[in-house]
Amino acid sequence: MDPNDAFSAAHPFRWDLGPPAPAPVPPPPPPPPPPPPANVPRELEELVAGYGVRMSTVARISELGFTASTLLAMTERELDDMMAALAGLFRWDLLLGERFGLRAALRAERGRLMSLGGRHHGHQSGSTVDGASQEVLSEEHDMAGSGGMGDDDNGRRMVTGKKQAKKGSAARKGKKARRKKVDDLRLDMQEDEMDCCDEDGGGGSESTESSAGGGGGERQREHPFVVTEPGEVARAKKNGLDYLFHLYEQCRLFLLQVQSMAKLHGHKSPTKVTNQVFRYAKKVGASYINKPKMRHYVHCYALHCLDEEASDALRRAYKARGENVGAWRQACYAPLVDISARHGFDIDAVFAAHPRLAIWYVPTRLRQLCHQARSSHAAAAAALPPPLF
């Protein structure tokens, strides 16, 4: 008898001496953290690096609560307000290079984000086009196998084409809206520059008048007023001249409000009626006050302020003759030239000396007429013979 059999009989339970079990498979390593998306704005310090903006200035901007995302979403006017607040609250001397450097950094970051977004969009659109082409190929293959095309496939393709056409039209409308917004902002900035030039040199105040008064291909402006006597109320849809002069008084009140708000916020306050005043008037609901209309009749208001009796007599005469407001407007130049002759043909000094006219720019046409009158007066004086005694 085998001794192993005897041991097995004595010990029925016995360890299995087979091959060892395989070692447990170690768990897979955790995936690496996802890289930060490339289309997320960088930190403010990284954004302005290399553009000449001091770190102390960046710290002050951060203390005001501005981040890179906030600055990228701000307009040019809001950036100006932020810089004015930085100079007003912290008394911080913001260098000129820092102002331009910050704007350049924001433009570069916007361009980077737009390029990344366009690349990502192009990749998605490319994959979509590939999928669509594969679907079309498979449908053509099925159609070739079946010998024709079903009505369901035709209807599905028509619906898909309509959806794509709607998406394309929506994208075009969005581009047009963005382009119009940029054009309006550029035009607004150009008008502000024209106002600055008017404050420096006093010229160019009748650019709208010259463009509307004739010449070129501009449409003749329709006069919204009729000639009325003092105290007369106009009928129909047009207004009288008393209402016109009242608009200039309203502009003066709007200028005072803009000046008080500018002083309250520590901004530069305008000394004359500029685009800022017209924008404020539109903002508070006085949309009937606009720059072309007020600049067009400013010399008529000047005659009303300087010599009210002559202005009233002129109104009565033109009302009796049935003249329109355009002829009355042209007739208002001659009395003003006579008034300037008493002050050496210096019409700017005449405007500056009157409290209600000092806030208005002298019309270019009126200044030219005064200059011509001064030249003709000097030529006539030179042609006179010298006195005999």
Curated annotation (Swiss-Prot):
InterPro entries per UniProt: FLO/LFY_C, FLO_LFY, Floricaula/leafy_C_sf, LFY_SAM
Organism: Oryza sativa subsp. indica
Residues in coiled coil: none
Function of the protein: Probable transcription factor.
Compositional bias ranges of the Pro residues kind: 19-39
Site for Interaction with DNA, residues: K268, N275, R279, G326
Protein name: Probable transcription factor FL
UniProt KW keywords: Activator, Developmental protein, DNA-binding, Nucleus, Transcription, Transcription regulation
Top-rank taxon: Eukaryota
Annotated region (Disordered), positions in chain: 1-41, 141-226
Bias type Basic residues, positions: 159-180
DNA-binding region as annotated in the record: 221-225, 290-297, 361-364
The gene coding this protein: OSL
Pfam family, one: SAM_LFY
Composition skew (Acidic residues), residue ranges: 190-201
